[in-house]
Amino acid sequence: MRAAVLHGPRDIRMETRALLAPGPAEAVVQVFASGLCGTDYRIWNGDRAVQYPLIMGHEFIGEVVAVGSDVQALQPGQKVAVEPNYSCGLCALCREGNRNLCLSRTAIGIDVNG
């Protein structure tokens, strides 16, 4: 796959990367389009700490190309808009419906590769 990989502030490079198989509860999405927002700019500019190298992109749409063994809600070929945040689902904030405020939240394209 082709990926825009950030190696440091203002150092983004197009690279070919191996397509990883999904874990049991994961899906692989072929990205058709990705938006750029203020968070992306701050990461690219070095104003927000991330671990390099990072495949950026957290606002995207695409098509499911593979699913893990535990995934039942998605199928290959399905078009999707992605919610990039993983929350714990267990803390008080998550239980109150505020999963976006979870202190254990991880975001695709920010905390882990997009």
Name the predicted role of every residue range.
Residues 11-14, 39:
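Short N-terminal binding/cap micro-motifs at the start of the first secondary-structure element
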Residues 20-35, 44-95, 100, 112:
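Glycine-rich beta-strand-centered segment in the early N-terminal region that forms part
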Residues 1-4:
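Short structural boundary motif marking the start of a folded domain
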Residues 7-10, 34-36:
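Short polar catalytic/cofactor-binding loops
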Residues 103:
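An N-cap/entry alpha-helix motif that binds or orients negatively charged groups
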